Amino acid sequence: MSLWDSLLIPERERDQLRRDVASSRPTHAWLFTGTAGAPHREAAKVFAAALLCEQPDPQNRGCGECKGCVNVMNGSHADFTHFRTEATNISIEEARELVMKAQDRPTVGRWRVI
């Protein structure tokens, strides 16, 4: 069972994310928003895991078993930063920090995911 199977989001949205992961040139930015407990938070994490998945077949990325997936899901992947806030706005300092992280090159995976 892949990470995608557990998502509680509309099938159309899940399929779009999977297509983007399987693409050799995924969209450069996605922004996931939602209230606490919303399924979109989990979708963002699964999407990040799939982008950093070590499966060679793009159609199988998001396996949930490789080191890349496991590390993203437990929050310890070097190329994954999970940014969340309950505030309506983020501070200038937080925005600057995110921009700095986004400029870093990936260290382990193919992408830097924030």
Which residues are covered by each model-predicted region?
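P-loop/Walker A NTP-binding region and its immediately flanking N-terminal helices
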Residues: 1-113
